[in-house]
């Protein structure tokens, strides 16, 4: 058992204060040490969103190339697929997959807003108010939701960090997909691409692909791996980690919706089963690799946005409001505090939401 001279309160447990080393010492020295200095979270949000838009255009061009390179359906038949043999073909089920994605998009926006309210409560800003108070509606949308059993993450800036993690994972997956679909052309299994239409205006088709997320454009042959599965799995991972902090029911609901979406994709012959399985694995692995960090995205990814001449500053302003203040306790004082909390829990059946939220924000005052 490692014994530290002092501790700080932190959601994962007792750890040495991360700000024990001054920022100047932490990032001074060699060129690479300076490059590892984290960018401001607001800068990361803006720049990674710009990068995502650029990647979307790259993918749109890749879809254009893939459409032209797709094997002739009259000559090359679809590949054998065990999923096609096990699941009965139901034409048009891909529409329900799009509905699942739309539902999860709305739920993710709602969850992100609830995370923002948790952040406001953590820093002491309180709940916002609507110009006109509507009974029930204001309480539902503007009240703070916190599932204490599933909350193991620092609440300050949690909404910003969650968005950075989501958008960087999505951009990485789409960029890799742009390479994969161009490299190997597979015969299309769905009915819509058995007689693929000719693209008359490539530029217009690329723009429509970006604006409608592929829904209003022409593209066939983009099989390995499934873009629909990527966004379904991203929403699944987002709610499995962050949605569970807001309400326990988000995990089972999103899991059922995502699995139904996978079924719709295979049953409609929109993608091969391998397209779905590979997309699930890559999305989960990427989301875990990006991780949740108080500094935002991993420093290796931040290197790609440092060169942008706009959209935010490259250095953090060390102000009193932005600098976390660590609350340190000696081990004897910490044991005494734990005893007091245990006594309250036995006497009153638990601690209040305010106290629980205070200890989730315990690293800040």
Swiss-Prot record:
Cytoplasmic side: 1-44, 114-165, 251, 297-365
GO CC entries: endoplasmic reticulum membrane; Golgi apparatus; Golgi membrane; membrane; plasma membrane
Enzyme Commission (EC) number: 2.7.8.27
Domain of life, source organism: Eukaryota
GO MF entries: ceramide cholinephosphotransferase activity; ethanolaminephosphotransferase activity; kinase activity; sphingomyelin synthase activity
Catalytic activity as recorded in UniProt: an N-acylsphing-4-enine + a 1,2-diacyl-sn-glycero-3-phosphocholine = a sphingomyelin + a 1,2-diacyl-sn-glycerol
Family recorded in the similarity comment: Belongs to the sphingomyelin synthase family.
Name of the protein described by the UniProt record: Phosphatidylcholine:ceramide cholinephosphotransferase 4
